Structures are given as C-alpha cells and as structure tokens.
Amino acid sequence: MPKMKTHRGAKKRIKVTGTGKFVIKHSGKSHILTKKDRKRKNHLKKDAVVTETYKRHMQGLLPYGEGR
C-alpha cells in the first residue's frame, strides 16, 4: 500500500502539541479591524485548540503528526 500524503496546506497552518492536540490560528485578524472591539481582537490573537469533533479530520490531513 502506498504511503499516505500529508496535506501541504494543513502542514503550514496546523501545529501538533506534545500531547497530540492540534493548534490553529484564529481567522479574522488581518484587515477590517476598525469595527471589531479590543476584546474581540485580543481573543483572536490567541491560538485555538481544535475540538474533538475535528480531531479525526486533522489526523487524516497530517497522518505522520507533522507540523511540530
């Protein structure tokens, strides 16, 4: 059986923690920021942990746990 391929876009955007969690950046922080309040922009700065619902999908995109 051939090797599974890593999704190259996912490799650039998703990091895998030591415990196996997937960490991504929030979207909506690059432009049109004047209408967003300070609290919202500060929350968008922080990394987001992928929920259990999407964890299986992320494992398919990164079969070898790349992105560390």
UniProtKB/Swiss-Prot annotation:
It holds the Pfam family Ribosomal_L35p. Keywords: Ribonucleoprotein, Ribosomal protein. InterPro entries: Ribosomal_bL35, Ribosomal_bL35-like, Ribosomal_bL35_CS, Ribosomal_bL35_sf. The keyword Mitochondrion does not apply. One of its GO terms (cellular component) is cytosolic large ribosomal subunit. One of its GO terms (biological process) is translation. One of its GO terms (molecular function) is structural constituent of ribosome. NCBIfam families: rpmI_bact (TIGR00001). Belongs to the bacterial ribosomal protein bL35 family. This is Large ribosomal subunit protein bL35. It comes from Fusobacterium nucleatum subsp. nucleatum (strain ATCC 25586 / DSM 15643 / BCRC 10681 / CIP 101130 / JCM 8532 / KCTC 2640 / LMG 13131 / VPI 4355). The gene is rpmI.
